[in-house]
């Protein structure tokens, strides 16, 4: 067991266990029972909390979009940089995120695995998209 359950933190423990398993074993080997074992909780805990595998993977995708948004915002550079440099900074942050969060990235962009109608999923994905769109818009405005 790589992660441990702390009272009141079941959701985060299960998401962390899922990410760990995705990184080490891949999506094809992922099961709710394995996630429970990795998190050190009862085999019924993931289903009880997330409903099914899609619900759990939706939570992983939500966390991924939140992390991506944070990375993109952190890449915002001082006002002195041009819009094209700022767009490049966002591109580098995006690529770095994809390389360092492979499990999240894999789930985020495979909508068949998640519940894309989940309001939190929608909000988190739109937040990341908005940061990228703003950088692109500013770049295009500079070009005209």
Where do the model's predicted regions map?
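Generic hydrophobic, amphipathic alpha-helix propensity
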Residues: 10-18, 35, 60-68, 72, ...
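Amphipathic alpha-helical segments used for helix-helix packing
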Residues: 99-116
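Amphipathic alpha-helical linker/stalk segments
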Residues: 2, 63-87, 132, 139-140
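Amphipathic alpha-helical packing segments from all-alpha helical-bundle domains
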Residues: 73, 116-142
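Hydrophobic alpha-helical connector segments
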Residues: 59, 73-104, 127-129
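N-terminal intrinsically disordered/low-complexity leader segments
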Residues: 1-9, 20, 80
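Helix-turn-helix
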Residues: 13, 17, 21-55, 59
């Amino acid at each position: 067991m790589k992660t441990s359950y702390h009272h009141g933190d079941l959701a985060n423990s299960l998401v962390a266990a899922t990410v760990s398993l995705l990184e080490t074993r891949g999506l094809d080997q992922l099961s709710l029972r394995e996630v429970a074992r990795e998190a050190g909780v009862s085999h019924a805990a993931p289903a009880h909390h997330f409903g099914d595998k899609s619900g759990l993977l939706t939570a992983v995708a939500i966390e991924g979009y939140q992390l991506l948004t944070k990375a993109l915002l952190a890449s915002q550079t001082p006002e002195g940089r041009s819009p094209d440099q700022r767009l490049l900074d966002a591109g580098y942050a995006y690529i770095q995120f994809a390389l360092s969060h492979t499990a999240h990235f894999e789930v985020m962009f495979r909508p068949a695995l998640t519940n894309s109608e989940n309001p939190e999923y929608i909000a988190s994905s739109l937040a990341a998209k908005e940061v990228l769109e703003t950088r692109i818009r500013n770049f295009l405005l500079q070009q005209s």
